[in-house]
Each structure stands twice: as structure tokens, then as C-alpha cells.
């Protein structure tokens, strides 16, 4: 195996011609993933970077740092030019640290972007400006009624049409869970995880949640025989979904360590499974291209301690 090398060019990053053509093409595909890493300089945000670096096959990472001054009370006045300079200096320090952290990994530093203003709007503007495959963020994971209330990561994920990788804690990046329901969105999540992440030597788990049919209908409208038939069809469908995921993974010689079919409320069962199996990364699709408000993905993001990769 040759040493991975690349050089900066005006059109992006291109691997050096130091390997055979097949490997060069593979490396170029590997390096072509374009990621936007959003950081406020917090440990939480760098946990996301460190975890992601353990999963990725390689990516060009742009870093955006927004110094958000909008939290200041209206009665507090600042000298515009001086405050802007202070913002820029703080952002430069954070971006410099981010570049050094990226260079310690297999990731490639793209460009540093500094903004002074409202964090969510600034990040959304940058996402609209460039074509990114994944947006990478940390989440502070507030508790109780504060959970995701006013969260930058929540607002960004809820308003973008690209995939996102959200992290709260640094972890071993070893166990990955595909939470799937067999829909096109879930199938896309499996394909993109294989495409963007290095799953070799990882422990792969697959979970399908069947909703309890007795909760889907008014009490007294179903007899026990009909309920049993519905449950039997659910099991057959779940078996098919797992076989399809297994078949897709086997194309890349990726074995499943454990699969499970459980019954209950999808978000709750996914959260429970991730906790019980000490999952490091949950991969999910979402039925809605942008908004995830009220979705299973949103609920899992709120509660789980694992990283979450939401594919759109």
C-alpha cells in the first residue's frame, strides 16, 4: 500500500501520481468528500472533529468559526471597529487550533472561515455558498426542557438539505448502528455511510423497530387474530429489511455483528438499543429533506449519547 499524498491545486485537492492508477482514483474519490466543520472553540465541537476523523475515509474540511455577539443585551454598546477586530482575533486563534487538530488526522484542511454575527445564519449562508457533503457539529446536549432549545446545531440541522454529523462526547468510534425502516431514505443512509465512512474493522449493528399494531388503531377495533397477522407481516418485513442491509454490506465485505427486531416506539427503542450496546455512532435517514422537527431523528438526537449521522 502506497503512502497517501496530495497537493493543493486551484481546482481542489488532487492525489499525487505516486501509486497505480486504480489506487490514485480511489484516493481522489476518498479526498473529494467536502465537509464543513462548525466550531465555537469549545471542547464539544472538537469532540465531533476527533470522532469524525476516526470514521472517515478522508475528507477536505473547511472550518467556520462564528463569534456570536447577538447574545449581548441591547443596552450594551460596543465600538464597532474595535469589537470586530476582537472577534477576528478570537476567530483566528480558534481556526489556527482547528487547522493543527485536523493536520493530526487523516483529514485535509481546506479553508478557514471567520464570521462575526449570528451563528446559525452565518453557518447557513456558508452552506448555501459552497457544495458540502456533510456538515460536522458538536451539540452541548442540554437537559430537560432546555434540550436542543435554542441549540445552534438543532437550528442548522433543521434548515439544511445536506447530511449532518452531530457529536456530544468523544468516544471510541468503534460501534456503528444502522437504525433502518427499509424506506428509500434509510437505504440512502446505508449507502452514504458506506461511501463516506471507513467501516473496516468496525462493529456493525442493525436495528429495525416495529411499532406495536395495537397502538395504531382505536381500542376495540381489532381482534387478537388480526393483531397476530399484522405482527407476523411486520416480522417478515423486518427480516427482509435486515437481509437487504446485510446484502449491501456484504458487497464491501462488511459483516454485521448483531441485528435486532424490536417492537415499540421507534425513537425510544433506537435510543435504548444504542445505550445497551454502547453504540458510538447511529446512522439514520430522514423522511424530510430539510426539516426534522418532530421526527424520529430529532428525538434520537435529543436523547442519545452516541454520535448521530443524519443522511438527507
Task: Kindly label every feature range from the protein language model.
Residues 27-81, 175-228, 247-254, 303:
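Small/aliphatic-rich secondary-structure junction motif
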Residues 81-93, 226-240:
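A short acidic, glycine-rich active-site loop
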Residues 6-25:
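Acidic, proline/serine/threonine- and glycine-rich low-complexity intrinsically disordered segments
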Residues 1-12, 134-155, 173, 281-303:
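Glycine-rich, Arg-bearing micro-motifs that act as flexible, cationic patches
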Residues 1-2, 25-31, 81-85, 100-135, ...:
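Structural beta-alpha unit
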Residues 151-169:
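Short, structured interface segments
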Residues 21-23, 136-139, 163-169, 310-312:
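Short beta-strand elements of ligand-binding domains
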Residues 65-67, 139, 208, 285-287, ...:
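Short secondary-structure boundary segments
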